[in-house]
From Swiss-Prot:
Zn(2+) binds at H562, H566, C674, H678. PANTHER family: ALANINE--TRNA LIGASE, CYTOPLASMIC, ALANYL-TRNA SYNTHETASE. It is found in: Cytoplasm. It is an enzyme of class 6 (ligase). Keywords: Aminoacyl-tRNA synthetase, ATP-binding, Cytoplasm, Ligase, Metal-binding, Nucleotide-binding, Protein biosynthesis, RNA-binding, tRNA-binding, Zinc. SUPFAM superfamilies: Class II aaRS and biotin synthetases, Putative anticodon-binding domain of alanyl-tRNA synthetase (AlaRS), ThrRS/AlaRS common domain, Translation proteins. It catalyses: tRNA(Ala) + L-alanine + ATP = L-alanyl-tRNA(Ala) + AMP + diphosphate. Consists of three domains; the N-terminal catalytic domain, the editing domain and the C-terminal C-Ala domain. The editing domain removes incorrectly charged amino acids, while the C-Ala domain, along with tRNA(Ala), serves as a bridge to cooperatively bring together the editing and aminoacylation centers thus stimulating deacylation of misacylated tRNAs. The keyword Nucleotidyltransferase does not apply. It comes from Rhizobium etli (strain ATCC 51251 / DSM 11541 / JCM 21823 / NBRC 15573 / CFN 42). Its cofactor is Zn(2+). One of its GO terms (biological process) is negative regulation of DNA-templated transcription. This is Alanine--tRNA ligase.
Length: 884
């Protein structure tokens, strides 16, 4: 019963038998809670229930909540691996009462589970209570039979919990276990309380007050209970170990690490770091977070890269973490099915990220090694170098700190921050501005004066209104004449203002005295629609009655493209997985662009399936419906909300199509919260044609597509190209592909023959081969040669051939490119690697070539330099080093 999975089941089953609803863990990304980076406690998903903003169909609940503490003020990242209990990912077991039972029942339930369910010896248990909470102290005496010395009164905030400056709050009672005299530490409240002897494992929070302002508390009419027990801590207690990394789950994970890389753990911090970071990385990815350079994605990247650096310390030569994932899924997939469902995505993300990072990790560590070569214990790495590691090599600051930890070398944090701020300031100085002439103050004042513009464009493309303001040359004007570029505000408009990725409408606004050609419509301030255009006839004045007509053809293309993004979004989620989320879009008249979260390039087959699924819904010609409802109702009905988008109390829900496959069969195909304009039936989209996909950043892919008339034009152009190509190749259009493939094969053969000829010439060719360049230095054969016209990437292969030809010795090859730069490769045969290091020798060559550095293995290393004219000097420098 002491295994992690058994403890979790025992806890949940116990409270279920006592009338509690088992509620699944909420995601690690809190919904509608911008105050939190990640879910870090069991009560997070019930916050609105405790405050009365949300009702649940149950009054008591129990959960095993996934939690992450990394980033923000709750950040345990730096300590993980070096202490017995710090983790970035942990599970919080909890039971909750929403105005149902209170202190007595909470204490009684906890006591019975601890002593009877988990079998902890009563004489080793003790509790803390808030110093003013006499009721809790009396209840512990009554229920547990504790004497006064087992009930420790704490007067500080450690035993009084509050959600914020205002809101529900109340005293806490924590349950501790005495781990014995052989463990250092004193009881809570004593000077030695930071020791490990007395271990807190369960916190009971009694929410009985409402704090209206600091220091002012009123009793709640329906007091509540919020408790939290660390699953990993309870596992330590029941398994009789001092470190969470010695519990069964972590022993299994570290055992897999040992088996995979062949290095025993034996107290290794690296094994512990990798095991913990694998858990947090996998669960974050399963909950929709992907590595990126900002926000939650950057925290995930920091966690992953820290683990990858420790894998490198253990000697891993290729990506490791994805190989450990099956063990994690086996151990935790039953309790958290989302982990098993997302296994393929997690594995691919881990593999790709580690593969990308390994390319720069060694170079960054080499720079770090050089920069700290002269530093001693207690010294500080300068902030400029730390920032260069961050900016150039992708080293998060904490990774640099961790790499120097064993040598007890610090990092100049202030210098790092200064370097980052200087870079930001320089970037700002190069920013040319948006070209917007009117200041935000003008739009704010107009919004205050006239209120929001009424949008009529969902129902009509033509309307009448009254001009409320004319802005010309950055200032409000009374009128505008032919030729003037203006920004017009009207009391109501059928013109859609750019938002949600959809471009603004164009068209014409005319009065009795003048006409304006509108090229764009933007939103300013809070709901102010601003029409940008040029007066093409007469005069337009403030206060004029005007007729407004939207460019119908342009609006129709925008509608088709916007509706197509919804169909593509849903198709992508069906084909790639539910981790796909919209990260940005551009809906223009001639095309659409759509950015989504996904860790790797899409295959041609996946793109074809996505396109086919979208066109299936187009061919249905089913009605596109819109409804207004509350955000909560919309999401409850399955509508997709865009992460980070702000929504009002009432939202517009756009539905289109009927699903034909799987879980979507005979259900609405696409349901999204959206304020844009759309077709009235999917058939009006005409055709969806994906042009391609590309990367716009780590973990984000971009699709580009065309619809309707643009798709027809694109296909016609493609057809013309194929016919022209067929004529050039003197074949039928249907034979173009096979003819091109034959030409490519022929070219490859010729290129290979040419490369082979160059290699032979480079090493001397013909008779004698490379022998002419071989000499003996200090009793060792030395093949030194300067080579032109050979691709630098072929130098290693030539060096291997050189080693084979001389049998035993050292090979130094300098390749000189057309621009005069040089590449150097040094190879040492196996029998001489104890005597000579290829890395040392190639660095000598690099210095002679005007470069510095270089790296590789003792038997093969490479470097470069800007001055290829010094190739012979570089070879002689290596020979001189051999001579000693």
């Amino acid at each position: 019963m002491s295994g992690v999975n058994d403890i979790r089941s025992t806890f949940l089953d116990y409270f279920k038998k006592n009338g509690h609803e088992i509620v699944p863990s909420s995601p690690l990304v809190p919904r509608n809670d911008p105050t939190l980076m990640f879910t870090n406690a069991g009560m997070v998903q019930f916050k609105n229930v405790f405050t009365g903003l949300e009702k649940r169909p149950y009054a008591t609940a129990t959960t095993s909540q996934k939690c992450v503490r990394a980033g923000g003020k709750h950040n345990d990242l730096d300590n993980v691996g070096y202490t017995a209990r710090h983790l970035t990912f942990f599970e919080m077991l909890g039971n909750f009462s929403f105005g149902d039972y209170f202190k007595e029942n909470a204490i009684e339930l906890a006591w019975k589970l601890v002593t009877e369910g988990f079998g902890l010896p009563k004489h080793r248990l003790l509790v803390t209570v808030y110093s003013e909470d006499e009721e809790a102290a009396a209840l512990w005496k009554k229920i547990a039979g504790f004497s006064d010395d087992k009930i420790i009164r704490i007067p500080t905030s450690d035993n009084f919990w509050q959600m914020g400056d205002t809101g529900p709050c109340g005293p806490c009672s924590e349950i501790f276990i005495d781990q014995g005299e052989n463990v250092w530490g004193g009881p809570p409240g004593s000077p030695e309380e930071d020791g490990d002897r007395f271990l807190e494992f369960w916190n009971l929070v009694f929410m009985q007050f409402e704090q209206t302002e600091p220091g002012v508390r009123n009793p709640l009419p329906r007091p509540s209970i919020d408790t939290g027990m660390g699953l990993e801590r309870m596992a330590c207690i029941l398994q009789g170990v001092q470190s969470v990394f010695d519990t069964d789950l972590f022993r299994t994970l570290t055992g897999t690490i040992e088996d995979t890389i062949g290095v025993k753990a034996e107290g290794s911090a690296s094994h512990r770091v990798i095991a913990d970071h694998l858990r947090s990385s996998a669960f974050l990815i399963a909950d929709g977070v992907l590595p990126s350079n900002e926000g939650r994605g950057y925290v995930l990247r920091r966690i992953m890269r820290r683990a990858m650096r420790h894998a490198q310390l253990l000697g891993a030569k290729e990506p490791l973490m994805y190989k450990l994932l099956p063990t994690l899924v086996q151990e935790m997939g039953r309790a958290y099915p989302e982990l098993a469902r997302a296994e393929a995505l997690i594995s691919e993300t881990l593999k790709l990220e580690e593969g990308r990072f390994r390319k720069t990790l060694e170079r960054g560590l080499s720079l770090l090694s050089d920069a700290t070569a002269d530093l001693d214990k207690g010294d500080m790495l300068d902030g400029e170098t730390a920032f260069k590691l961050y900016d150039t090599y992708g080293f998060p600051l904490d990774l640099t700190q961790d790499a120097l930890r064993a040598r007890e070398i610090g990092v100049d944090i202030a210098g790092f921050t200064d370097a980052m701020q200087r870079q930001k300031a320089e970037a700002r100085s190069h920013w040319a501005g948006s070209g917007e002439k009117a200041t935000e103050t003008i739009w704010f004042e107009l919004r205050e004066k006239h209120g929001a513009t009424e949008f009529l464009g969902y129902d009509t493309e033509a309307a009448e209104g009254v001009v409320q303001a004319i802005v010309r040359d950055g200032a409000v004007a009374a009128e505008a004449k032919a030729g003037d570029k203006v920004q017009i505000v009207v009391n109501q408009t059928p013109f859609y203002g750019e938002s949600g990725g959809q471009m603004g409408d164009a068209g014409v606004i005319s009065s009795d005295h003048g006409k304006i050609e509108i090229s764009d419509t933007q939103k300013r301030g809070e709901g102010l629609f601003v029409h940008l255009g040029t007066v093409i006839e007469g005069v337009v004045r403030d206060g004029d009655a005007v007729a407004m007509t939207v460019d119908h053809a342009r609006r129709s293309r925008l509608r088709a493209n916007h509706s197509a993004t919804h169909l593509l979004h849903e198709a992508l989620r069906e084909v790639l997985g539910t981790h796909v989320a919209q990260k940005g879009s551009l809906v223009a008249p001639e095309r659409l662009r759509f950015d989504v979260s996904h860790p790797k390039p899409m295959t041609p087959e996946e793109l074809k399936i996505v396109e086919d699924m979208a066109n299936e819904i187009v061919l249905q010609n089913s009605p596109v419906t819109t409804r207004l409802m509350s955000v909560d109702d919309a999401i409850a009905e399955g509508a997709m909300a865009l992460f980070g988008e702000k929504y009002g109390d009432e939202v517009r829900v756009v539905s289109m199509g009927t699903g034909l496959h799987g879980a979507k069969s005979n259900k609405p195909y696409s349901v999204e919260l959206c304020g844009g304009t759309h077709v009235s039936a999917t058939g009006q989209i005409g055709l969806v044609r994906i042009l391609g996909e590309s990367a716009v950043g780590a973990g984000v892919r971009r699709l580009e597509a065309v619809t309707g008339e643009s798709a027809r034009e694109y296909l016609a152009e493609q057809d013309d190209r194929v016919k022209t190509l067929a004529a050039s190749l003197k074949v039928q259009p249907s034979e173009v592909l096979s003819r091109v493939e034959a030409l490519i094969d022929e070219r490859r053969k010729l290129e290979k023959e040419l490369a082979d000829a160059k290699r032979k010439l480079a090493m001397g060719g013909g008779q004698g081969g490379s022998g002419d360049a071989v000499r003996e230095v200090a009793g060792v054969k030395f093949l030194g040669k300067s080579i032109s016209g050979v691709d630098p990437k072929d130098l290693k292969g030539l060096a291997d051939e050189g080693k084979t030809s001389i049998g035993s010795g050292v090979v130094a090859l300098i390749g000189v490119s057309e621009d005069g730069k040089a590449s150097a490769v040094v190879a040492v045969t196996p029998d001489l690697v104890e005597r000579y290091s290829a890395v040392d020798l190639v660095r000598i060559a690099s210095v002679a070539l005007g470069g510095k550095g270089g790296g590789g293995r003792p038997d093969m290393a490479q470097a470069g330099g800007p001055d290829g004219s010094k190739a012979d000097e570089a070879i002689e420098a290596v020979a001189l080093a051999l001579a000693g």
